[in-house]
Regions:
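Glycine-rich phosphate- or other oxyanion-binding loops that anchor nucleotides, phosphorylated ligands
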Residues: 1-125
């Protein structure tokens, strides 16, 4: 539901502290309800967003110990832009590759999981 980051994206807002980018609760609740209704496997929680997705010293174990579910690259910027413009936002991620194990989904698994993500997203409209 939130997005941790090592990016300096928030600096542009010149805030006197650290901004914690989060999803809109209503969108998150409705997306979880839709995933339940469709019978899809899903998780709700924090992601880690980085400007460098693959890096030699990512400290992934430390993020895992903090309960972070996945690594991606855009969530904080989306949440901050939405907050700044007075809009709601929700990041819905579909896991295709495991950067810890090297495991990757097949083309068929990827197609199905992306379709599931789109079903949930379209249900929010």
């Amino acid at each position: 539901m939130g997005a941790c980051t090592n990016s300096n994206y928030a600096m542009q807002y010149e805030l006197p502290g650290t901004y914690a980018p989060i999803a809109d609760f209503d969108l998150c609740r409705r997306a979880a309800e839709a995933a339940e209704k469709f019978g899809y496997n899903y998780k709700v929680g924090n992601v880690f967003s980085s400007d460098t997705f693959y890096t030699e010293n990512a400290h992934n174990d430390k993020w895992i110990n903090m309960g972070v579910l996945a690594v991606e690259m855009e969530a904080p910027a989306l949440y901050m832009n939405a907050a700044r413009s007075g809009n709601k936002a929700l990041v819905i991620c579909t896991v295709s590759d495991n950067i810890l194990t090297g495991e990757a989904t097949t083309a068929e698994q990827r197609q199905n999981s992306f379709t599931h993500m789109m079903d949930v997203a379209f249900s929010l409209l």
